[in-house]
A protein has these predicted regions:
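C-terminal segment of classical bacterial N-terminal signal peptides
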Residues: 14-21
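Immediate post-signal-peptide N-terminus of mature secreted/exported proteins
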Residues: 23-55
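Bacterial N-terminal signal peptides that target proteins for export
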Residues: 1-9
Length: 139
């Protein structure tokens, strides 16, 4: 339940806020973590994104990693590996089944964040240098 509430709040931050507000207010590290977690859940359940969505996902992932490496005030490798070792593993351990509401939400969220419009929003966000850990992760 907590995951669903958090995911809903974060989805709003990533998908529904105006582009200018998202650029200023959303943590790049948060966006990166959510994309990685949702993608890992789909991988775990053997669900592939369409080629165009996977290509957008990979471009956004690479762009966010580059941004984190260029702008992080803390060790960027530790930030990225922490997402892998903590957030992704915890999400997969908490995934009840590939039929659960949480998993269905992951599919929906990743569909929303792999649209061309969302990729453009992310590109705009990454054009504004700042600490990638500063910003909201769900309002």
């Amino acid at each position: 339940m907590q995951k669903s509430v958090l995911a809903g709040l974060i989805s709003s931050a990533l998908v529904l806020v105006p582009i200018a507000a998202a650029r200023a207010d959303t943590s790049v590290t948060c966006m990166y973590m959510l994309m990685r977690v949702y993608h890992a859940e789909l991988d775990h359940c053997h669900i592939a994104l369409s080629k165009d969505r996977e290509d957008r996902y990979q471009r956004m992932k690479a762009g966010m990693e580059k941004f984190i490496h260029a702008n992080a005030k803390q060790d960027p490798n530790a930030i990225i590996s922490g997402i892998e070792t903590d957030n992704i593993k915890r999400a997969l351990a908490g995934l009840k089944s590939c039929q659960s509401d949480d998993f269905k939400y992951a599919i929906q969220a990743l569909d929303e964040v792999t649209t061309p419009d969302h990729e453009k929003m992310v590109q705009g966000t990454l054009a504004l240098p700042r600490d990638p850990q500063i910003g909201d992760c769900g309002t």
